[in-house]
């Protein structure tokens, strides 16, 4: 998100660190990717010293602060009782937090904690962080970006983090008492309505099948690319 221009960024639930690599390419000088010990170090998109193994259901403490903390589509994979722990870890790391998590009915593999946006908004508010709905309007029509990022991403900022925010972001502050609502196209909203009626096992099976298809397509494209060379 170019308006923020952070120089230090931490990502909780980073996977291989792909987002951190993108922030680095965008000008961030110091990044830290944090995820479980299961992440294959040989597949990291960042340097090994830029990765930290941690259990996200437990407090993550790095002993330092960052210009920006982020967690994108991670909260839905953690038990509901770990929701406040995740937010605690994020707010401990920065005055500004870029956050998204799957909403109710989104569906996905290993989703155990899909919640309305207001669920997370309330947890951040208890920590003194206000929602700024600056990301969704900027991305909503960009179909090159996955819908869960376009429709779920919210910037949370505390009083200290307000200092230096561009006026374009300040103008998007969600008024006190106003709950965040789902965004998205008609098709996306219909998907949410349908999926939330399905048993979790069915949703997981669909998500796994879709992941297999996408993986096969990716491998096929890679093979064709090599053949062309």
What are these regions (language model features)?
Residues 1, 140-143:
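Nucleic-acid endo/exonuclease domains
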Residues 1-110, 114-119, 158:
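Conserved SAM-binding loop
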Residues 23-24, 124, 129:
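Hydrophobic alpha-helical packing residues
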Residues 86-88, 149-162, 186-203:
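A short, terminal or domain-edge coil/loop segment
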Residues 129-140:
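Conserved S-adenosyl-L-methionine
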Residues 143-177:
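Core SAM-dependent methyltransferase catalytic element
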Residues 171-229:
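Membrane-proximal basic amphipathic "stem/tether" segments
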């Amino acid at each position: 998100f170019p308006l923020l221009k952070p120089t230090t960024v931490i990502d909780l639930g980073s996977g291989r660190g792909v987002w951190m690599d993108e922030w680095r390419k965008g000008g961030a000088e110091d990044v830290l990717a944090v995820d479980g010990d299961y992440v294959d170090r040989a597949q990291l998109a960042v340097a090994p010293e830029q990765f930290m193994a941690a259990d996200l259901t437990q407090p993550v403490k790095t002993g330092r602060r960052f210009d920006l903390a982020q967690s994108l589509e991670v909260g839905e994979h953690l038990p509901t009782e770990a929701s406040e722990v995740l937010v605690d870890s994020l707010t401990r790391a920065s005055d500004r937090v870029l956050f998204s998590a799957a909403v109710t009915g989104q569906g996905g593999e290993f989703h155990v904690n899909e919640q309305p946006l207001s669920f997370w908004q309330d947890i951040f508010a208890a920590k003194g962080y206000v929602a700024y709905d600056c990301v969704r309007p900027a991305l909503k029509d960009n179909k090159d970006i996955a819908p869960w990022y376009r429709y779920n991403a919210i910037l949370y900022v505390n009083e200290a983090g307000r200092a230096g925010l561009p006026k374009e972001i300040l103008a998007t502050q969600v008024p006190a008492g106003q709950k965040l609502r789902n965004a998205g196209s008609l098709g996306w909203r219909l998907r949410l309505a349908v999926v939330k009626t399905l048993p979790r096992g069915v949703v997981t099976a669909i998500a796994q099948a879709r992941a297999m298809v996408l993986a096969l397509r990716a491998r096929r494209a890679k093979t064709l690319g090599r053949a062309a060379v």
